[in-house]
Amino acid sequence: MLPLVLFILLAATLLFWKWQGNHWRRLGLEAPFGWPLVGNMLDFALGRRSYGEIYQEIYTRNPGLKYVGFYRLFNEPAILVRDQELLRQILVGRNFADCADNAVYVDHQRDVLASHNPFIANGDRWRVLRADLVPLFTPSRVRQTLPHVARACQLLRDQVPLGRFEAKDLATRYTLQVVASAIFGLDAHCLGIHMRVAHEPSRWLEWLAPLFQPSVWSLLETMSLLHTPRLGRLIGHRYVPLPLQHWFRELVEARSGGDNLLQWLAESKRGLGKEELAGHATTLLLEGYETSAMLLAFALYELALNEDAQRRLHIELDEVAQRHAGNLIDPVALGELRYSEAALLEALRLHPAMQALQKRCTKTFTLPDQKSGASSELKVHLGTVLVLPVQAIHLDPALYPAPNQFRPERFLNQPPMGCRFLGFGAGPRMCPGMRLGLLQTKAALTTLLQDHCVQLADEDQCRVEVSPLTFLTASRNGIWLSFKRRTRRY
């Protein structure tokens, strides 16, 4: 009797899995079969490939389709959007309100400070939180942060590393120095003598630098953030660890007055309380240092690989420096560095901080036919996740000829257009700190390359591999470079 019961249970389980894995096909949609538990994300679950690479494969295998059905972890049906017009409708057009929520899972009771992040917040709350931050990043406000950036650049200039160095580590030291000063009015001690004296470590580096480092734990965190809150609760995940939450609250209490972002927030009309200030400070700090550090490291790497692009950038630096008496950390001079900014945008195209955006349907709406000329619309139900594959879009040869080549000229004569470039997102939920991020990164790139050439530390070094273990893009084995002094031509 027992063998028969077990056989029936096994057969029922297999039939259920088959039925579940054919969800999209039953609705007449072209889609791969979804395997039990892992859906189409097996290599991601095993830490073999990043989630961006999985989505890129689905994107590439389905040319001619406006969208593709697929299965996330735990075989959850989802939709990957390919069509540029559909992307526009979802991000900035008539369907924005239907899927305005970002599908990122954080326990708001355990992660109180992270819950103030407008990227994470959902419902109507994200609008209120974003409205608090937007006034901090107007062009005039961003210019007011330039003294903080200039001080960090001076420290960076005084100690350009000799010999082999890891680019992301150097970039993280710099961006932490900037954001600590710009947000709190504090010195993070990440550059200067503290960089050279091993027995005087910076608390900022000790606590924040490891936060986004690849590890098995970071893979579990990425799964819980992007796929299932149940896993997050099971492993006790916090986007902002508890000791950091306590420390951020202390920093808010100890902030200095003057021209810093936190002081401007405290003086805002909404009259923010200490907990709201701590939440916004957490957002500004975590999103202000990591993504900019990643961009600076990858920009240096791409310029080391592409000598012609680096040569052209040096020519621009020399020409602009000649017009400004050698001072490039100046709002007018930085604005004239168009090729340098194009190089940063091109590095961000090749290495986006987030490899995909995920939107959760907040009300039922209808997608057009999957293929042009077909006559079968798809009703998207409440709770369905729509994936906007940033990495795949950025590497689509139909949108960018020779997409794997580093060509800053793509962005030289025109800004990124439409939804072809999603390095900062798009629409009402676009990154509000884009201007400050580009300013601090461009200033650092200028400082490092005004008197130096950058090159690979090892001539036979292969292309940098992206770690499959992290939520934000990171290198698997580091980005190892070296500097060589050059003579300015002015």
Curated annotation (Swiss-Prot):
Its EC number is 1.14.-.-. The keyword Metal-binding applies. Gene3D superfamilies: Cytochrome P450. Heme binds at residue 431. The keyword Lipid metabolism does not apply. Disulfide bonds: none annotated. One of its GO terms (molecular function) is heme binding. Belongs to the cytochrome P450 family. This is Probable cytochrome P450 308a1. It comes from Drosophila melanogaster (Fruit fly). The lineage of its organism: Eukaryota, Metazoa, Ecdysozoa, Arthropoda, Hexapoda. The gene is Cyp308a1.
